[in-house]
Design a protein with these regions (language model features):
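Short, surface-exposed loop or secondary-structure junction motifs
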Residues: 2-197
């Protein structure tokens, strides 16, 4: 476990798990450093990471936290993360232009992310781990529009309700938008939200 047995969902959501910022982009095979690819390899590498400090005692912004949260959602629900988010979050909120891997008819509306592989990327995740694993991860890869994001924000501002439909309990919104990080940690975080930067 390398000190990971005490990590909780709350630690992952507040970046207080103690895990490193990210997984390595290369692995050593027979003494040679090589690139890797594939979702399963990303999960294997994330699970293999050691903690830098005991969970709950410090803050490290870590993609690994949300990579693992995405995997937990898939394990618990039995659904691919892309399907779960579409069916359980985006469609119920009327966010019709939000998701992973934008379709060709939405790509022209997607803001370019960066120059990579000899061209400006549009509709391709900016994060190298997400790109290597098919574009769907808990920590990166999602695309949306201003209109869809506004719907999500309205739901949060209305304590979990949008257009008369209850999507989240007010207590859930409070946990997201108020300090949930341990008192020993300088960075103030809600569950999945940054509070003070």
């Amino acid at each position: 476990n390398q000190g990971k047995e005490a990590i909780t969902i709350r630690h992952l959501m507040t970046h207080t798990s103690g895990l490193n910022p990210g997984i390595p982009l290369t692995i050593e095979i027979d003494g040679v450093s090589k690139d890797w690819a594939g979702y399963e390899m990303a999960i294997t590498l994330a699970k293999a990471e050691e903690v830098r400090h005991p969970p709950g005692t410090g803050f490290i912004y870590s993609d690994i936290n949300f990579i693992l949260l995405g995997e937990i959602i898939q394990q618990v629900t039995g659904k691919h993360l892309e399907d779960f988010t579409r069916e359980s979050v985006f469609l119920p909120l009327g966010m019709k232009d939000t998701g992973y891997i934008p379709s060709q008819n939405l790509r022209y509306r997607t803001a370019p992310t960066k120059w990579w592989d000899g061209k400006m990327q549009r509709g391709t995740p900016n994060n190298p781990i997400c790109r290597r694993t098919g574009g769907v991860h808990g920590h990166a890869g999602m695309f949306t529009t201003a209109a869809d994001l506004a719907r999500y924000c309205r739901m949060i501002l209305n304590q979990g309700e949008l257009d008369g439909v209850r999507f989240l309990q007010p207590e859930t919104v409070r946990l997201m938008t108020s300090v949930q990080s341990p008192s020993a940690v300088d960075s103030l975080r809600g569950l999945g939200w940054d509070i003070n930067s």
